[in-house]
Regions:
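Conserved class I S-adenosyl-L-methionine
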Residues: 2-60, 62-71
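Conserved beta-strand signature within the Rossmann-like core of class I S-adenosyl-L-methionine
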Residues: 159-169
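A short SAM/SAH-binding and catalytic strip from SAM-dependent methyltransferases
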Residues: 133-148
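Class I SAM-dependent methyltransferase SAM/SAH-binding core
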Residues: 79-122
Length: 294
């Protein structure tokens, strides 16, 4: 006998559940937002998160990739340096400009090709051919109302493997340690669960592992820190700003690496918090459907 809970799990339309979740959320950041932040993202070295992603993706030498939502090239550049051909796509023109600087810096013009493309674009009209790359990846970049359509676009483009990461806990922009300390509840969305279940419904066999990404937030003054962390209070918790200021004042310490390049390439601030913020990402990989199976 099948339990009610099992039946509900199997019968749930997870893409419709995802759409409802997106409708209740703050609107996704648009290209203009990422354009404004592009200069803070410069791929000059391979960071621990990128190394962990690449280890799990297991892209073979000589294989071609689609890097969807590539940003400034945190993965496209390392893959290019390994000799892989990469089609690096993003919906932010300025991000692609910064990527172009990285391509020229590393002399990767023959290996990494930037392309302006959004998840919700018509990929056929944009020239994205079926089974045109060996591996399709989307690292921390799936921001779309229709998750199933996005996953199917990756599936249709890749011949051998698809790899994505989605948040496994709360928002990557929220420091749970701080929020707990100042009495603000945090809703953990577990975005990856939706993708996993959609893929299962599509007949794929997704595999899941986790990447713990430590983040060290730095700032130069208390006021700067408050302004930066205040983003976590948007959407109904703005009245907790005094508690946030008090917390930061008691937990800010000198940063021994002040002035050195941070994760996004810009100089680190003079102060940091006395704890490391950890973000958990779910890495999901699957074998795409072949053209003869469609």
């Amino acid at each position: 006998m099948v339990s009610d809970s099992h039946a509900t799990l199997v019968e749930t339309n997870w893409n419709e559940e995802w759409k409802a979740l997106q409708a209740a959320r703050h609107p996704a950041d648009d290209p203009a937002f990422w354009d404004s932040r592009a200069r803070h993202f410069q791929a000059r070295e391979t960071h621990p998160y990128a190394r962990a992603f690449m280890e799990r993706a297991a892209v073979a030498p000589g294989e071609s990739l689609l890097d969807m939502g590539c940003g400034a090239g945190s993965l496209a550049i390392p893959y290019g340096l390994r000799g892989n051909h990469v089609l690096a796509c993003d919906f932010s023109p300025h991000m692609l400009d910064v990527l172009g600087e990285g391509i020229r810096f590393h002399h990767l013009e023959a290996l990494v090709t930037p392309k302006l493309l959004a998840w919700d674009d018509d990929w056929d009209a944009a020239g994205m051919q079926p089974k045109s790359v060996d591996v399709a990846i989307a690292s921390r970049s799936i921001a779309t109302h229709d998750l199933a359509a996005a996953l199917l676009k990756l599936d249709r483009t890749a011949r051998r493997r698809c790899c994505i990461t989605l948040i496994a806990t709360g928002s990557p922009r929220v420091d749970r340690h701080i929020m707990d300390a100042i009495g603000v509840s945090v809703t953990e969305s577990h975005d990856y669960v939706y993708a996993f279940n959609i893929l299962v419904r599509l007949g794929r066999h997704p595999e899941v592992s986790y990447i713990i990404s430590p983040r060290r937030d730095t700032f130069n003054t208390l006021d700067e820190g408050v302004a930066d962390f205040a983003r976590m209070l948007e959407g109904g918790n703005e009245e907790r700003l005094p508690e946030l200021r008090t917390y930061l004042a008691h937990h800010m310490v000198e940063n021994p690496e002040a002035g050195m390049p941070g994760e996004k390439g810009r100089p680190q601030g003079a102060y940091m918090l006395d704890h490391v913020r950890e973000v958990c990402w779910a890495f999901i990989a699957w074998k795409p459907q072949g053209l003869d199976e469609e």
